[in-house]
Each structure stands twice: as C-alpha cells, then as structure tokens.
C-alpha cells in the first residue's frame, strides 16, 4: 500500500462522524490489502505501530521532531516551534510547513506502508548516546520523501498523538465485516493475542483460525480489571462469591518457560531486571511452562507500604541489589492463565483457582468463599486492619477476560471520591512557583478524544512540581500565553468533593475542590476514567440526594 493512500484515508476518516460509515470504509480497505500490508495497516490505523507486548518504543518527543522538520523544510528550529505552537496540532503544523518548504528534496522515493514500518522499527531499536541524533536522521529521511499530507500522519504516529476517530471497537467490526467472521471471535482473538495486526491476518483465514488462538509465554496479555461496587450488589447474582484481599501494590504477570522467567507490569513493560528478588521467589515457587497474575507489595516491619514504593522499584535501573536488600517485596498470586501448554482463561474462576493452589507452593492469596454479607464484611475489615485497600469479590463461574473491566470482578474499598485523569496541559505558576507549572489541565476519555474536565493546583509538594516540570518538558506540543499543552502521557489520581454541571468545560461537568493525590505511573491512557464514568457518578450522587 502506498503511504499516500493511507494518509488520504486517514484524512477522510477524520471528517466522518458516523460509526457505521467508518466501519464500512475500513472494511473495504482491509479486504483489499495484501497479506504483508494487512498487519501494518491495522496497527498504524490505531496509531500503534507495535503490539503492547513487544516492548518496542519510539521515544520520539517534540524536540527531535523540531530538529528534523527544521532540516527538511529549510527553516530555523525556532520558526518550527512557533508554527507548532500557533497551529496547536503537530501533524497539521508539519503539513503546513512541508507545503511551504523552501528547498527541494533530491532522491525522494514514493513511500509505502512497509517503508514507514521499517523506519519505525529502526527508530525503536536505537539506544545509547548517539540514538537521538540517529533518530533525527531517520525522521529527516522519511519526511524528505513525504508529501505534506503524509508528513501530517507520520508526525502523528511518531508523537503517538494519532487521533482520527478509529478505536479498537471500530477496527474489530471492520475486520469482521471485511472477512465475514463473527466480531465476537475477533474480540476474543485480540484478548488472547493483544495485536490487531495479527488478528486481522487470522480473520482472513476464517473463524476456525480465530478460535484456535492460544496464549504463549513471554507474550503478555492485558490484565483483567475490576469495577467498583458493593457487597450486596454482587450477592444479588445469587451464588457464593470468592473474596480476596485487595492489595495496595503493583499488578504483575509472571511468565516461566524452559527455566527462563520474565515479569511484566500492568502496562506490559518487562520489569524482570528491576525485580530480581521477586522473580527468584516466583521461580522457586512455580513450575515450568506457566503464566500467572498477581500483585506485589512492599513490606516493612510486617506491614504493607504504599504502592509507590513498588513503582519506584519497577522504574529502577541502577543499584537494584541495594534496593532489594532495603525493602522486602512479597508477591501475591490470584490467577493462572496458562500451564503446561494449556490456555486456562476460558475455564471458570473456581477451576483456575484450584489449579493455582495445586501448582504454586507459596504466595497464593488467601480466599473466602461465601454468600453471607455479614461474613464478607468481617473479612473486608480484616483486610483493612491488615493495612490492605479492601477486598475483591469474584464470580466463581467467570472466565478471565484480558483488558476488560466487567461485572465479574468487583473491588470493595473505603469510599473515596477519586478519578484517574489524563494531564493535557499546564499553566505557569506564580510567586515561589514561577519557575515550574502551578496548575494542570485534566481530561477524561470520550471515545478516542480527550475532553477537559478540571484544573488542579493543590496537593503537590515542591519536589513533585519540580519532578513534573522536568518530566513534562519533552511532551510540550503547544504554548499559548501562560498555558502549555502536552502530548498526553501521564495519568493523575485526583480527589474531589463533588461533580458539578459546568458550562466552562467541553464535557459539561467540572470537579469541585480537586486535589492531586498521585501520579498513576502504573496506568496508561486507556485506563483513565471516561466521560461516561463522570456522568454516571454525577447521576448516582444526585439520585441519592433526592431519595
């Protein structure tokens, strides 16, 4: 596929608001692609050139882009920065600059989808002291051959700011329509393989190929998620439920095969080297050829420590042994996804739990099975007294659904009004905070868009503000007076006293007395709260006030 065709399709899709029309156009394109182009297309149309499990990262920030665009267009770097700041959208700004470039590129070639993917793979593999310069050279090379429209979408992909109105749901249905297969099977295959590119290739082969997908060690899948709820609400399902401690730690997946062990974070990043002590414990406790799901907690003096302690270990690259000696890390296992060449996610939870207790010699989380609300509440208070967050209620007949926040797992913890919001902008501070950001613009997810809902200026320590200022420098994509706007990457946990209707924000709601609690480095943008979540909370709160 010629990349210009891809760019023209993206431009067309951006202008379409109807879901069915989007799916129809995608399906027509997908059905016409070659086997080689099909996986590339399905990854790039989502703005994600690599599967989450691959570990590949582009690591291209605005500063690298400024340098490459300045070279290709024959402009000064400051002119490029000014244009991007004024236009607001980096892709649109690069399109403008390429259409006005003052020098002619020689030896340009017609770019294909495969060319762009090859360049992205090349960029992702660059490490070391010269990697930044090498990345700039690759970006210069592809932009030199790009038309203005191609440059628009190359930029959006490089900055991971690709929003054309196509999400996984639309792509799933388009793949199903293109190859006349059941969309539920496409969804199932993507849960297992976590790669729409691979799933599209399987769908072309037919429904049996989709049904036959299997988990593979060292190919992590998204972790099953829980929704908030109540004990009484879960018990209405009628059957006894499994009750487990909800730990204040960091989620992980542990894979072991042929005596090789790897550990992955909630975001599917490998953390094996950062957690050698935990890996050693699990290696000793578990047999070969296995994938388990769990949560690791930091313990000091017999009591659990805040989960930030674990996250600091996940990020650590140096002095790991000293950190491991300083604080004890304890893994807690609560599910098993694969064992002895058998995928287990389709088994009922009670059966998975039985297998886990049989094969793991240690570290399986305690469990109560009950349909008695009083007994479950007592267990909940036992968890709180032990320093844990609360309890998890799990339906015993439920399958493991990777990446899904459904009704089968419910978390019960003390009432706290918090939201996980995406940081999309900031305003310079005043007084003693004049050299850092003083407040932050926060947004919720609304389909593939981010909609502002609040600003937050309280709850930060001076050290946190300095860290955030340093961390967010390379994410700035636009400046407007005292405001700066970021390529969305960080998620804040925000406390608040009330959700109010407000005309001041696009979503129609605002937070009263918002306060910063912490950076949720364990969560990516897909796990931030949605506009629908906010509306539901508003309705629930005001319904209870009126009864």
Swiss-Prot record:
Alphabetized UniProt keyword annotations: ATP-binding, Cell cycle, Cell division, DNA damage, DNA recombination, DNA repair, DNA replication, Ligase, Magnesium, Metal-binding, Nucleotide-binding
Cited Pfam families: DNA_ligase_A_C (PF04679), DNA_ligase_A_M (PF01068), DNA_ligase_A_N (PF04675)
Cofactor: Mg(2+)
Domain of life, per lineage: Archaea
GO terms, molecular function: ATP binding; DNA binding; DNA ligase (ATP) activity; metal ion binding
Positions of the catalytic residues: 246
GO terms classed as biological process: cell division; DNA biosynthetic process; DNA recombination; DNA repair; lagging strand elongation
Family: Belongs to the ATP-dependent DNA ligase family.
Stated role: DNA ligase that seals nicks in double-stranded DNA during DNA replication, DNA recombination and DNA repair.
Protein name in the entry: DNA ligase
Lineage of the organism: Archaea, Methanobacteriati, Methanobacteriota, Stenosarchaea group, Methanomicrobia
């Amino acid at each position: 596929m010629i990349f210009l065709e891809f760019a023209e399709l993206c431009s067309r899709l951006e202008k379409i608001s109807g879901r069915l029309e989007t799916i129809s156009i995608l399906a027509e394109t997908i059905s016409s692609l070659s086997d080689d182009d099909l996986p590339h297309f399905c990854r790039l149309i989502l703005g994600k050139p690599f599967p989450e499990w691959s570990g590949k990262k582009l690591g291209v920030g605005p500063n690298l882009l400024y340098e490459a665009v300045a070279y290709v267009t024959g402009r000064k770097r400051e002119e490029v920065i000014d244009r991007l700041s004024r236009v607001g959208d980096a892709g649109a700004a690069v399109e403008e600059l390429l259409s006005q470039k003052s020098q002619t590129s020689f030896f340009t070639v017609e770019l294909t989808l495969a060319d762009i993917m090859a360049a992205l793979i090349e960029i992702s593999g660059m490490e070391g002291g010269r990697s930044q310069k090498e990345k700039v050279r690759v970006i210069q090379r592809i932009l030199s051959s790009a038309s203005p429209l191609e440059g628009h979408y190359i930029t959006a992909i490089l900055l991971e700011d690709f929003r054309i109105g196509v999400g996984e749901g639309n792509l799933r249905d388009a793949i199903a329509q293109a190859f006349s297969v059941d969309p539920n099977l496409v969804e199932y295959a993507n849960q297992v393989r976590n790669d729409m590119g691979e799933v599209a290739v399987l769908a072309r082969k037919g429904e049996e190929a989709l049904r036959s997908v299997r988990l593979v060690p060292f190919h992590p899948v998204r972790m099953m998620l829980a929704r908030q709820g109540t004990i009484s609400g879960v018990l209405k399902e009628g059957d006894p439920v499994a009750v487990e401690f909800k730990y204040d730690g960091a989620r992980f997946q542990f894979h072991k095969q042929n005596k090789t062990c790897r550990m992955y974070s909630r975001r599917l990043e490998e953390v094996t080297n950062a957690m050698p002590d935990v890996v050693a414990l699990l290696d000793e406790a578990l047999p070969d050829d296995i994938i388990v799901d769990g949560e690791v907690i930091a313990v000091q003096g017999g009591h659990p420590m805040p989960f930030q302690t674990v996250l600091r270990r996940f990020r650590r690259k140096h002095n790991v042994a000293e950190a491991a000696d300083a604080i004890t890390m304890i893994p807690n296992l609560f599910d098993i996804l694969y064992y002895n060449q058998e995928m287990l996610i389709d088994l009922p939870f009670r059966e998975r739990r039985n297998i886990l207790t049989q094969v793991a010699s240690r570290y399986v989380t305690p469990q109560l099975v009950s349909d008695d609300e009083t007994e479950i509440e007592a267990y909940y208070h036992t968890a709180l007294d032990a320093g844990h967050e609360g309890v998890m209620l799990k339906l015993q007949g439920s399958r493991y659904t990777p990446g899904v926040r459904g009704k089968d797992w419910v978390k019960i913890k003390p009432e706290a009004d918090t939201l996980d919001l995406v940081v999309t902008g900031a305003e310079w501070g005043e007084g003693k905070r004049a050299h850092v950001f003083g407040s932050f613009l926060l947004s919720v997810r609304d389909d593939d868009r981010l909609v502002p809902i609040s600003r937050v200026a309280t709850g930060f320590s001076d050290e946190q503000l300095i860290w955030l200022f340093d961390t967010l420098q390379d994410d700035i994509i636009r400046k407007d007076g005292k405001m700066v706007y970021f390529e969305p990457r960080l998620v804040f946990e925000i406390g608040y006293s009330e959700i109010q209707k407000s005309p001041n924000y696009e979503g129609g709601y605002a937070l009263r007395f918002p306060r910063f609690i912490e950076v949720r480095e364990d969560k990516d943008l897909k796990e931030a709260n949605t506009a629908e979540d906010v509306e539901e909370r508003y309705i629930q709160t005001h319904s209870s006030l009126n009864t």
